Amino acid sequence: MRPDKKNLSSLSAATLAVHGGNVADATSGAVRTPLVMANSYLLPEDPATMDWSSPDGLVYTRNQGHNQVCLEKKLAALEGCEAAVVFATGVAALHSVFFSFLKSGDHVIVSDITYQAVWRLFAELLPERYGIEATFVDVGDLDSVRQALRPNTRLIHTEVIANPTTKVADIGALTEIAHAHGALISVDATFTPPPFFRASQQGVDFVVHSLTKYINGHGDAMGGVVIGTQRMIDKIKNDALVDLGATISPFNAWMIMRGSVTLPLRLNQLLSSAGKIAEFLDSDDRIAYVYYPGLASHPQHELARRQFAGKGYGAMMAFAVKGDPDTQNRFVSNLRIITSAVSLGHDESLIVHVGAEGRGGFDKYPEEFRQYGHLRFSVGLEDPEDLISDITAALDETFK
């Protein structure tokens, strides 16, 4: 098939990242999609002919705007799915799935190691306020997942690579379990963006990304997306976007559209650098432990190798230096290139010391995490040798 930007399915990932969703401006002739800052769009001469309940069409930016539509087309194509809907944040995207497809009396199986906002939703808010029950399960133990199923189980939710422990879930196996039971499966794939991994190819119903992270990749815009079939996405648009209003701003949609152009190139650098840095950390006897799926010592290394088809193992890792929480803090304060800040997937490397205090599900973390605490490390685009030198110097300063 001849590659043609009018036929997105004909394009490789790198080409798609450049051309997907891009619409040249008919008025100015600009070859890139312009930023459209408008609350409202022109109605037809006879508004009575409109389907006001349709999620399609440009009417009011809370429903959808031009930049939002362009970004959705690109993200759906990158994931290899029919449709996408973007939101103001990744948490809003996650909530949209739960709000649209769960009701009082339903039961959900959730990974016992999960993002804190999801943990609180299913441990506190949804059960207490809406009567939605949740069971937190080690999704790496497929028999435990099967045993947790109930007649009213409506959804299984997991992350591909768990935040922050880097535990890897077998997405294909979990999808089979969910669908055999007549349940849906939603997957947070923020740590594993396309083209590195396409969770949709495992048959999941909903792929969720925090666009704030790798897909934007520059630490300057927030957003989230749910990707799936047209029917499922239309329901989310109708139920959880138009009348709840967590709509992405045109500016952030435009920024993420721009940032995503370099996604495949950035991933190549990030995956390569992360592997080198993980091996370095693993070799230093001042390091208490390193959890990175690319290391042979990682509990799910073989699963990661098979599931990610040799493309890499992500750019997130967790480790700790030998010592107590104060030792972790001193090490972080001695870094000169790596930035101490929350978030991940940015152009710059980010590290955060995460303690046990107040974290839901911490008792399910590996023993080393509970003993030492842990440092969540998001590898950035800097030269890996510079990052290794920074870590070495910080270790020397910490243990002198």
From Swiss-Prot:
Organism: Pseudomonas canavaninivorans
Source organism phylogeny: Bacteria, Pseudomonadati, Pseudomonadota, Gammaproteobacteria, Pseudomonadales
Homology family: Belongs to the trans-sulfuration enzymes family.
GO cellular component, one term: cytoplasm
PANTHER family: CYSTATHIONINE GAMMA-LYASE, TRANS-SULFURATION ENZYME FAMILY MEMBER
Name recorded for this polypeptide: Canavanine gamma-lyase
GO BP terms in the entry: transsulfuration
Keyword RNA-binding: no
Coiled-coil regions listed: none
Induction per the UniProt record: Up-regulated upon growth on canavanine.
